Amino acid sequence: MTEKHTEEEILFIKLCKGLVEICDRINRGEPAYLVNDYQPFPQPLYEAFEQLSIKWILRDEKMRHPSILNMVEAARHSVEAVEPDFCQWVDFPDEPLIEDMIQPSEECEDFASDYSLSLEIDNNQSYILRLMDEIKKYDLPLQTYTIFRRFIAENPFPSEFDQALLLDKHPEIERVKDLLEEAYQPAPPQSHDMGLCKKCGGYLDCAAREINECCEPLEQKVDKSPIIDTVYCLIRPSLIELRLAKIIKEMGLEVELWPELDKADLKITFPDGKIWAIDAKDWGSATRLARKLNQDKIPDIGQSQSFFVVPDYRLKKLQDQAIFKSKYQGNIEVISESELIKRIKKELK
């Protein structure tokens, strides 16, 4: 289900996307601003500033920030410092969107991921939907989607041999090979010294630092690394899904990842034929997650029960838990990983 965004929220998403791109440039050893370029700043950041400038002049009769550089500096102080109206979208408006000068905050990353996932933003077709369209266009088996996504999730730094092996084992992937290449970029020569996580491909000192099994440093030089959208939109969200699939499969149950072109994250089939549908969710903003889930649903894949499942470590944060519970109004039950496993065990008795 496509999430509905207000114009104000789209502005904030563009801002966050632009800030993330600037931080990524810095972390890759590139200039944050391309001084001699026609467009020195990331396009989403430029668009956010342009639209905010109109808003400020109409509302305040003056510019709140005279330049993009000033706006970026404000983002290092707090969300409220950038624009007070943005406070409604975040859990902690008095905290910065850029931490330690060069790292996007967890909430900033969370909103930035929507730029690549949402069709509503400037008709920007999401990578995942383009993959689905290509699979339908070439009449490929639906399992192609699962194979493709799993490869990316498990291979943040694939070698040429890894990709050749994938194509040899699954020749149907050849039809969507260009999209596979699009998920990666050439790694900088200093990739092994950049503080990249070998699990997700993101930066070690980043918003993924609390993700289970993440933040293990990359120790060898690599040829390819995932683009930042791949990290946020494909790899990190898949960590909980792959983790759950492994545990449930070891319990002797049939588990299907991303069934029927991602109608759910997990389809669990019990020995008696009963089916549960799981949509696994991680978040950087409890406010944003609640708003998303209030609009979300899990389509029919033959299930008798549906659950939204979140990582255990998220629910250990009582403040996040309180924020989420106060804002979630949906009908689908939201439970933790460990609670899901507990219920599966009970169902098997």
Task: Explain the meaning of each model-derived region.
Residues 15-19, 55, 267-277:
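Active-site beta-strand-loop-beta-strand hairpin of nuclease catalytic cores
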Residues 333-349:
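C-terminal helix of von Willebrand factor
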Residues 2-221, 227:
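Nuclease-adjacent, charged terminal/linker segments that flank catalytic cores
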Residues 84, 281-330:
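Catalytic cores of nucleic-acid endonucleases
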Residues 259-265, 278:
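C-terminal structural cap/anchor segments
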